Regions:
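Multi-pass membrane proteins that catalyze or facilitate reactions on polyprenyl-/lipid-phosphate substrates
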Residues: 2-24, 30-169, 173-297
Length: 297
């Protein structure tokens, strides 16, 4: 029975990781927001910042989520791209449901009696930041499909990884949208698709070019995650109410920003019904995963 319970726990954590991973490759959707919605944000931040002090404990906590994120990114990159290109509204409402389904645990973290001017300002400013990002016209931004790699470009990829990873773990801020605004989104996601396809077909020769781009990007991601995680942990310890109000502003604005970014086209009854269904599915998934999380986030 203990073994079955352990397997169930790990599968639950891997599934959350899949959701977080998929969120990180969609412009306008935040992996950090999904961490909050899944009820694991504080646990993951603590494990990252205490990786060297509590090495095995942190590895044990992080591993299933990392595995899930890799599965989500590699397995669903093509599917999500297809969904956004052909069924953008239902795809985005799925993630809006995932966001809103996990809001309750975050709200419970805020001590309403301690809400003051600083907390209100943090909420308003960060809410406005996400709306501003949502208003950016992603269709007008030039994104190269491929990049010729050299020493200078590798350094740029490391820096991009640092910026993108930092935004990936800040709730409400989309690392993919930041990459798109900087003009590198198509190149990075294209490399991920190529690598995933080559891995699936065990084609080592085809892995060379995407690895050349993704490896320095991955190094930057690791460096960026540690830096931002340390900052977030310090803020939640020093200014918990203002910090969580700010996080709530980031998360609460995300569905609106995502809708702003969505190309509605010509709405039909079938499309609206599909959007409602995917929203309900996303909401239910987030609610259930947050409910069964060990962390009462």
């Amino acid at each position: 029975m203990k073994l079955l319970a352990l397997i169930k726990t790990y599968l639950n954590q891997i599934l959350r990781g899949v959701v977080i991973g998929v969120a990180n490759i969609i412009p306008g959707v935040s992996g950090g927001t999904m961490m909050v919605s899944m009820g694991v944000y504080d646990t993951l931040i603590h494990s990252i910042t205490h990786l060297f002090k509590e090495f095995w404990k942190s590895i044990k906590a992080l591993l299933p989520y990392v595995v899930g994120m890799l599965i989500g990114i590699l397995a669903f990159a093509s599917l999500i791209s297809w969904g956004l290109e052909n069924h953008e509204l239902p795809t985005n409402t799925l993630f809006i449901g995932l966001i809103l389904g996990g809001l309750s645990p975050l709200i419970k973290k805020i001590d309403r009696k301690k809400i003051g001017p600083a907390a209100i300002i943090a909420f308003v400013l960060l809410f406005a930041l996400i709306i501003w990002m949502g208003l950016q016209n992603k269709d007008s931004i030039q994104n190269a499909d491929t990049i010729d790699m050299n020493a200078g470009q590798m350094l740029i990829m490391v820096l991009l990884g640092m910026v993108a990873s930092g935004t990936m773990i800040i709730p409400g801020v989309s690392g993919s949208l930041v990459l798109m605004l900087l003009g590198y989104y198509k190149a990075v996601t294209g490399a991920l698709k190529t690598f995933g396809h080559a891995l699936l077909h065990v084609d080592f020769a085809a892995m060379g070019q995407p690895v050349l781009m993704l490896l320095p990007f991955l190094i930057g991601i690791v460096l960026g995650i540690f830096g931002v995680a340390k900052l977030i942990e310090w803020l939640t310890a020093k200014y918990p109410t203002a910090t969580y109000c700010g996080v709530l502003g980031l998360v609460a604005a995300s569905p609106l920003a995502l809708l702003i970014q969505t190309n509605m086209g010509s709405l039909s009854v079938g499309l609206v019904v599909a959007a409602v269904i995917t929203f309900a599915i996303g909401f239910a998934i987030a609610w259930l995963l947050a409910k069964h999380s060990k962390e009462d986030a």
